[in-house]
Swiss-Prot record:
GO terms classed as biological process: translation
Recorded name of the encoding gene: rplK
Oligomeric form and interacting partners: Part of the ribosomal stalk of the 50S ribosomal subunit. Interacts with L10 and the large rRNA to form the base of the stalk. L10 forms an elongated spine to which L12 dimers bind in a sequential fashion forming a multimeric L10(L12)X complex.
Name under which the protein is recorded: Large ribosomal subunit protein uL11
Native species: Aliivibrio fischeri (strain ATCC 700601 / ES114) (Vibrio fischeri)
Modification comment: One or more lysine residues are methylated.
Length: 142
């Protein structure tokens, strides 16, 4: 008989920096998951990714308290801020521009996000990411 999924937990954890403190500890602890086991497995899986980059993770907790997890690509907004070299987006994106991104940078981000975004070609993903950039107060060149 297959294990029954008891809960799905969605978190954003910094790559290579998972530890038992909030938000990881309380979220996993309330479902009876071994927190240190998750932290070690997550850090091992994300060691090739730039340390500190927020990584969305979906943890499936089973009825015997075991778990599996799937990591996603970093959010587009984080990748855009990194590409533009800004700390945060604009509070007033239509009037106050905080940086610029090029078409080549959008292409690179779209290719990175391709694994998570389904049903769209690279051009459609680029347009979607360009919209995100504009809503953050970034100028899209190209």
């Amino acid at each position: 008989m297959a294990k029954k999924v008891e809960a799905y937990i969605k978190l954003q954890v910094a790559a290579g920096m998972a530890n038992p403190s909030p938000p990881v500890g309380p979220a996993l602890g309330q479902h009876g998951v071994n927190i240190m086991e998750f932290c070690k497995a997550f850090n091992a899986k994300t060691e090739s990714i730039e340390k500190g980059l927020p990584i969305p993770v979906v943890i499936s907790v089973y009825n015997d308290r075991s778990f599996t997890f799937v990591t996603k690509t970093p959010p587009a907004a984080v990748l855009l801020k990194k590409a533009a070299g800004v700390k945060s987006g604009s509070g007033r994106p239509n009037t106050e521009k905080v940086g610029t991104v090029t078409d080549a940078q959008l292409q690179e981000i779209a290719e990175t996000k391709a694994a998570d975004m389904t049903g769209a070609d690279i051009e459609a993903m680029k347009r979607s990411i360009a919209g995100t950039a504009r809503s953050m107060g970034l100028v899209v060149e190209g």
